[in-house]
């Protein structure tokens, strides 16, 4: 019976230790979750500009489309995806690339930039006195082989 009394006393001395452990670990977990959410939004923006660049390159690779047409397609795609503004995309419809075989081909190249302003760690950054605001320039490039204009017979 003496052993039972000692274990009860030891258990009584450990009361509240779970709360202290939770108080130590919870802020770290919240920071991790906030970072996952913030970087998820950043990745979504990156995927959007990548797809916009691909749409632009697809149109730029076709004959009879102007740079303004391509830039309009990119702007429409980004607006439909919830992103607006940003610098004018770079479009080069007369670029060339050399294949490993030595053959030179005509390609259309499109580069899209987007300033991704975001709040790092959401409102949690304010709790520790940080502003939590920052911005980075996302960039996506798409290159597609240019199609030749059909010749009339």
Language-model-detected regions and their locations in the chain:
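Short, conserved structural patches
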Residues: 2-5, 54, 58-153
């Amino acid at each position: 019976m003496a052993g039972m009394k000692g274990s009860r006393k030891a258990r009584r001395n450990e009361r509240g230790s779970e709360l202290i452990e939770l108080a130590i670990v919870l802020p770290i977990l919240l920071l991790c979750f906030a970072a996952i959410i913030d970087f998820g939004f950043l990745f979504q923006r990156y995927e959007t500009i990548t797809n916009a660049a691909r749409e632009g390159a697809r149109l730029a690779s076709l004959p009879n489309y102007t740079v303004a047409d391509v830039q309009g397609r990119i702007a429409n795609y980004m607006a439909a995806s919830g992103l607006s503004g940003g610098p004018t995309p770079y479009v080069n419809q007369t670029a060339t690339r050399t294949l490993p075989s030595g053959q030179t081909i005509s390609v259309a190249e499109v580069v899209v930039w987007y300033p991704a302003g975001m709040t790092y760690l959401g409102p949690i950054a304010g709790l520790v006195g940080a502003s939590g605001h920052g911005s980075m320039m996302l960039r996506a490039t798409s290159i597609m082989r240019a199609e030749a204009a059909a010749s009339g017979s």
